[in-house]
UniProtKB/Swiss-Prot annotation:
Membrane topology, as annotated: Peripheral membrane protein
Subcellular location: Cell inner membrane
Entry's Gene Ontology cellular component terms: plasma membrane
Protein name as it appears in the record: Putative membrane protein insertion efficiency factor
Main location as per UniProt: membrane
Taxonomic source organism: Synechococcus sp. (strain CC9605)
């Protein structure tokens, strides 16, 4: 078997896709857990529109677990009392 078959369209690509799907599912489940159990206890605190959890869901669904997860982490680091409020959509 040629190396290109294992890297591009072969077993490695399928493995990478499976890992990405599992990672995305774990991240989305974490956001769902936060929304269901933690957010109701602490109340609304996000300074942005959309909220950080909505941003995370959209970013991961739109860009995948790696880039979407990184965008979400950067957003969470910006969400604090010393940051101005406002609209901060997920980039294209």
């Amino acid at each position: 078997m040629h190396e290109s078959n294992t890297l591009y369209g072969g077993p490695m690509t399928k493995l990478r896709q499976a890992i990405n799907q599992v990672l995305a599912a774990v991240l989305l489940a974490g956001i769902g857990f936060y929304r269901r159990f933690i957010s109701p206890m602490i109340g609304p605190r996000c300074r942005f529109t959309p909220t950080c959890s909505a941003y995370g869901l959209e970013a991961i669904q739109k860009h995948g677990p790696w880039k979407g997860g990184w965008l979400t982490v950067k957003r969470l680091l910006r969400c604090h009392p010393f940051t101005p409020c406002g609209c901060d959509p997920v980039p294209d």
